[in-house]
Structures are given as C-alpha cells and as structure tokens.
C-alpha cells in the first residue's frame, strides 16, 4: 500500500483558524485544505499563515473554493480571470500549489463544454506561469456539470498539464452515480481526493452536503467502493477529509480531528 498524504479541510472543525491548525497538527495530519473564509478571518497575512502552518509541520495543500468560473459569457469570463489572479497572489504567499475550481452553479453559465474547456485551459495556463495547478470538481448541484465523468471530459478537452480533476466521494455518491469509471482515469490526472460520508436523508443535495456530512464509515454511502476505484486509477495523492456538519462545528475540535 502506498502511504497517501493525509489532510483535512479547515471547514471540518470548530474554532478559530489557529485553534483548527493546532488540532489538525495534534491529530497527526500532514496538511490542510484551506477554506478562503477561514483565511479571511485570520488576523495575520498569508505569509504569516504559511509560517504558522510550517511551524506546526502542516502543508497548505489546497485553497478553495474558486466558484462560478467556467462556461461563462466573455465579459464575465474576463472578470473571473482577474479574480483568479488575485487568488493566485494569495496562493503564492501561502505556498499553496493547488486551487479547487468547482463546477459553475450560476444561472448565467452556458451549457457549452467546449467553451468551458477553453476557459479552464486559459486558467490553467495562467496558473502554470506561477507554478500553480487547478483542480476541477463536479459539484452535485452544478448547473451543467454535476458528474465526475462530465468534469473529466472537459479536463480532457482542455488538455493542459496544470489542469486536473478533483474527486469527492460525497458529490458522486449523493447522486447515486457509479464510481467504477474512476478506475479508467489516469491516476496522475486526478489532483486531489476528498472523502466524506453521509447518512441517507430525504432533502435537497445542497442542504444535505452543507450540514450532514460525516467521516468515512460513519454514514451510509459506499465510500469504500469509491476509494477502491480511485486507487485502481493509480492515484497516489492526498486523501483528504472534507466534512460539512453542524454538529462538528460545535464540538471541541481536538476530538473531531482525532476521530
């Protein structure tokens, strides 16, 4: 078995970012997915945050989210590129190599995979100039792209070394999508893996996703099967826990991180 780098999203824990980082380091994780909101409430600069993570032995492995980017009319696309450059500035200061670009949920997004591919290619090209990478993830409630197969098809069309796929067990399994096809994706084109489970609940997928996810094995989704197919692809990057859950946000964070 390969030893995968273990990370956890800062959104998975309660407390200030400083408290979260301490709990994550104490629980033995290698790195974090940094949520922009956590960074915005951090009292110091991006450089100071990078130093703090370094001191705790944590890498900042992923910055997120970058929303509503691809498949946009030209004027909105140009504005989004400006937005991207500001994100890249922050990432450079954080020493963070990868940004998560989630599939567009905006009503202005066009159902045009070729346009989405071309726009993501441009984003990847700009990231590459700074030595950064872009991971594209299908959100279960994306407007035109909500399945990993659709996201992978767009990544293939974009055909850029600095653009890859981000997989999330919740987004795939919550829609009842079959993860078997992940095994056919070249492992090096998968840039990041997020794992979350959830109890089976009757509600909109966005409410379910944002309030009721839990750790792998604590819910009713077949996360093991999903993980198995991802390993079969040859993927050997991060194994990250991204858990949105109201209870965890109110629980002492050391206990959550150790669990």
Kindly give the residue locations of the regions a language model identified.
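Short, conserved active-site loops that position catalytic residues or coordinate cofactors/metal ions
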Residues: 27-36, 61-68, 103
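Active-site acidic/histidine proton-transfer and metal-coordination neighborhood
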Residues: 18, 55, 70-165
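Residue-level detector of anion-binding/catalytic polar loops
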Residues: 30-31, 59, 97, 133, ...
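Acidic-and-aromatic substrate-binding clefts and catalytic sites of carbohydrate-active enzymes
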Residues: 10-18, 34-48, 68-78, 105-111, ...
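Histidine-acidic metal/acid-base catalytic patches
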Residues: 1-7, 14-27, 54-56, 95, ...
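Conserved beta-strand positions in the central sheet of alpha/beta enzyme cores
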Residues: 33, 62-64, 100, 135, ...
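Short acidic, glycine/proline-enriched helix-loop-strand junctions
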Residues: 41-60, 132
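Active-site loop/turn elements of alpha/beta-hydrolase fold enzymes
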Residues: 36-37, 65, 101-104, 139, ...
